Amino acid sequence: MAGFQHLSVMPEEVLRFLSPRPGGCYLDGTLGGGGHAALVAERCAPGGGTLIGMDRDLEALKAAAERLSRFGDAVRLLHGNFADIATRLDSLGVDALDGFVLDLGVSSHQLDTARRGFSFQQEGALDMRMDGDSGETAADLVNRLPEHELERIIREYGEERWAKRIASFIVRARSEAPIENTLRLVDIIKGAIPKAKWEERLHPATRTFQALRIAVNHELESLERGLKSAIDRLKPGGRGVVISFHSLEDRIVKHVFREYAAGCTCPRNLPVCVCGRQPRVRVLTGRPVTATEEELRDNPRSRSAKLRAVEKL
């Protein structure tokens, strides 16, 4: 699948924090086109190491299989949501990991393939499903949900201050005809946001499309569940690296890392600890790492990327 092109974000930083070693077992839970996975496999495959790649997008999985074929049996690929990491690793008989990486961004290929429905710049079916063949589509949501629920999704997942007007305009438009393609929804959103309030460097539909994509794919719930499962599987000294692309994702990553890094939670007035809680990870990134100026020039989509990393104690 030569058409599946995706520039991996912060490749050098991922390798620096993950520190993959020969013979180790590593997981890429959001495989995409296999860019990060290839970098990790190059370092862990010697000495009998394994790279496990997982993605819910079959097109991405097929592209990655081609890209990673040179590593032979050192690479094992799984189709599924990284929220189910625990059960999928069990099915492989993998009890522990030396490291994992999660790149939470939508790939360039997904954005640029009109029929997937992720892009607000191309006409296509209003789909937005990562796996492409199960669950409700974005069209299902915008045509079925009551106005107050649409408003909540757009406000919470898109952090869109015009959520109330956008939801109202959607409900009004769907009463005339079902909303089934991307550009019709874009026109509705543009009509809802006063043109004088459009942001200079942000398309008016950006936040609403993000919100619908998150809702369709249950992204935030999947992130928290999958991230905790991956940390639980790390060996002592094993590392986890996560790249997020918006504040909702980054907030969850930061919260989970802090939760696992926390020690005693007893009230301060107790003379001795009775909870027995010990830190389970060490946070390696006090502040999130961002792309260099050079990378921003080469890959503008890295602009919003934030990398956080932990090490299992």
Swiss-Prot record:
It comes from the Bacteria. The keyword Nucleus does not apply. It is found in: Cytoplasm. Keywords: Cytoplasm, Methyltransferase, rRNA processing, S-adenosyl-L-methionine, Transferase. Its EC number is 2.1.1.199. Pfam families: Methyltransf_5. One of its GO terms (biological process) is rRNA base methylation. It is an enzyme of class 2 (transferase). GO terms for cellular component: cytoplasm. S-adenosyl-L-methionine binds at G34, G35, H36, D55, F82, D103, Q110. It catalyses: cytidine(1402) in 16S rRNA + S-adenosyl-L-methionine = N(4)-methylcytidine(1402) in 16S rRNA + S-adenosyl-L-homocysteine + H(+). The keyword Methyltransferase applies. GO terms for molecular function: rRNA (cytosine-N4-)-methyltransferase activity. Its main location: cytoplasm. Transmembrane segments: none annotated. Belongs to the methyltransferase superfamily. RsmH family. Specifically methylates the N4 position of cytidine in position 1402 (C1402) of 16S rRNA. This is Ribosomal RNA small subunit methyltransferase H. It comes from Pelobacter propionicus (strain DSM 2379 / NBRC 103807 / OttBd1). The lineage of its organism: Bacteria, Pseudomonadati, Thermodesulfobacteriota, Desulfuromonadia, Desulfuromonadales.
